[in-house]
UniProtKB/Swiss-Prot annotation:
It holds the Pfam family Rad10. One of its GO terms (cellular component) is endonuclease complex. Belongs to the ERCC1/RAD10/SWI10 family. A motif (Nuclear localization signal) lies at residues 17-23. The gene is RAD10. Residues 26-64 have a biased composition (Polar residues). This is DNA repair protein RAD10. The lineage of its organism: Eukaryota, Fungi, Dikarya, Ascomycota, Saccharomycotina. Residues 65-80 have a biased composition (Basic and acidic residues). Component of the nucleotide excision repair factor 1 (NEF1) complex consisting of RAD1, RAD10 and RAD14. Interacts with SAW1. It comes from Saccharomyces cerevisiae (strain ATCC 204508 / S288c). It is found in: Nucleus. InterPro entries: ERCC1-like_central_dom, ERCC1/RAD10/SWI10, Restrct_endonuc-II-like. Involved in nucleotide excision repair of DNA damaged with UV light, bulky adducts, or cross-linking agents. Along with RAD1 forms an endonuclease that specifically degrades single-stranded DNA.
Length: 210
């Protein structure tokens, strides 16, 4: 110990103290830089989140609008309802002129209707046209006199499957005839509606035209 140079020992202590001081200073500087970086990240987070939100997919499920739609004009355009355009046929029933003497017409009191007739170019095969549906009319007594009449009337309309036959049961012993009429309707794409008087037959047309 007596041979140790005190100057050298003191210089070592001074060097150690200096290293400790530099180390502590470096830690302080590092913590400050970390705090600065953290504050910068906190300031940048809202901007980043806003960018993410603005890039979200807009669809019918989240019901969100882009930011450029926030002005009043764009919002009005977005909320404006489109005008409704009905594609349904008109409510006026078209009646073939061959039905002029049909008592059914006297009972069509709550439905608008007008006569139409066939021309050389435009042939009319229906008795009544209701909402785009072709309707044929037949009575049991007439069918017994002219059995082939209804099948000939159905033939040009059979390519469509939305046809209707209004059949008035105005005679007794109709079971066999009804079976035949039902088969004709099934094989020619007709819906069979049975009525027992002209007033009831007219009600069918009024209901179909609602």
């Amino acid at each position: 110990m007596n041979n140790t140079d005190p100057t050298s020992f003191e210089s070592i202590l001074a060097g150690v103290a200096k290293l400790r001081k530099e180390k502590s200073g470096a830690d302080t500087t590092g913590s400050q830089s970390l705090e600065i970086d953290a504050s910068k990240l906190q300031q940048q987070e809202p901007q980043t989140s806003r960018r993410i939100n603005s890039n979200q997919v807009i669809n019918a499920f989240n019901q969100q609008k882009p930011e450029e739609w926030t002005d009043s004009k764009a919002t009005d355009d977005y909320n404006r309802k489109r005008p409704f355009r009905s594609t349904r046929p008109g409510k006026t029933v078209l009646v073939n002129t061959t039905q002029k003497e049909n008592p059914l017409l006297n009972h069509l009191k709550s439905t608008n209707w007008r006569y139409v007739s066939s021309t050389g170019i435009n042939m009319i095969y229906y008795d009544y046209l209701v909402r785009g549906r072709s309707v044929l009319f037949l009575t049991l007594t007439y069918h017994k006199l002219y059995v082939d009449y209804i099948s000939r009337r159905m033939q040009p309309l059979s390519r469509n499957e939305n046809n209707i036959l209004i059949f008035i049961v105005d005679d007794n012993n109709s079971e066999d005839t009804l079976n035949d009429i039902t088969k004709l309707c099934m094989f020619n794409g007709f819906t069979l509606l049975l009525a027992f008087n002209f007033e009831q037959a007219a009600k069918y047309i009024e209901y179909l035209n609602l």
